[in-house]
Amino acid sequence: MKIIAVIPARYASTRFPAKLMQDLGGKTVILRTYEAAVSTKLFDDVFVVTDSDLIFDEIVSNGGKAIMSIKEHESGSDRIAEAVANLDVDIVVNVQGDEPFTEAGPLEQVLSVFKNDPDKKIDLASLMREITNEDEINNPNNVKVVVDQSQFALYFSRSVIPYPREKDAGVRYFQHIGIYAFRKQALLDFYSLPMKSLEASEKLEQLRYLEFGKRIKMVETTHVGIGIDTAEDLERARAMLRDI
């Protein structure tokens, strides 16, 4: 089974423009993310796929592998699908470009779904972690997910789901961790589907998959991703790097 990681890297980030090219301890954010993915030794290959000459040159000039894509993509997974269409690969892992502290543990967890699925009944897997802090639960930047008894996703939302009308119902809240692992054909199928109202409303690409009746297997983790969405996040990442 050939497994690759692909890191979608769009230059014009809405909340923090050019964040992937920001300096983080002497290297750019995107280069650190690429090197972190390579260092896990879980993948047969690692690529950055980007619409930016700057990002492409940053990766290639430092010995990495990059693929240019068109600019007009609805999501990172769409960008990845374009890049891997002609690659000989079985599993494609979407690693977020703004996670320079990517570790092997959570990636191994999501890949375990496919290694324990000999009949190939699961096409897409992702991660979630339990959250209990009210601020985290109510933060629209923390995407919540609810699952069925078999740990397949029922819905993702920036809103609080489920709504806590009954405070003593014993509900657990889960934050979606944005690492996806696709079988290649499932990724190409995703790419062929048009955006519908749920994805457009929430701006969550995974809702496209659910809206067309597909299933996403969720794996619970304790991993806390260190994503860089704001200038404040970047400063925290710099402080964290100094402490390593």
Curated annotation (Swiss-Prot):
CDD domains: CMP-KDO-Synthetase (cd02517). It is found in: Cytoplasm. PANTHER family: 3-DEOXY-MANNO-OCTULOSONATE CYTIDYLYLTRANSFERASE, 3-DEOXY-MANNO-OCTULOSONATE CYTIDYLYLTRANSFERASE, MITOCHONDRIAL. It comes from the Bacteria. Belongs to the KdsB family. GO terms for cellular component: cytosol. It catalyses: 3-deoxy-alpha-D-manno-oct-2-ulosonate + CTP = CMP-3-deoxy-beta-D-manno-octulosonate + diphosphate. HAMAP family: KdsB. The gene is kdsB. Activates KDO (a required 8-carbon sugar) for incorporation into bacterial lipopolysaccharide in Gram-negative bacteria. Pfam families: CTP_transf_3. Keywords: Cytoplasm, Lipopolysaccharide biosynthesis, Nucleotidyltransferase, Transferase. Pathway: Nucleotide-sugar biosynthesis; CMP-3-deoxy-D-manno-octulosonate biosynthesis; CMP-3-deoxy-D-manno-octulosonate from 3-deoxy-D-manno-octulosonate and CTP: step 1/1; Bacterial outer membrane biogenesis; lipopolysaccharide biosynthesis. One of its GO terms (biological process) is lipopolysaccharide biosynthetic process. One of its GO terms (molecular function) is 3-deoxy-manno-octulosonate cytidylyltransferase activity. It is an enzyme of class 2 (transferase). This is 3-deoxy-manno-octulosonate cytidylyltransferase. Its EC number is 2.7.7.38.
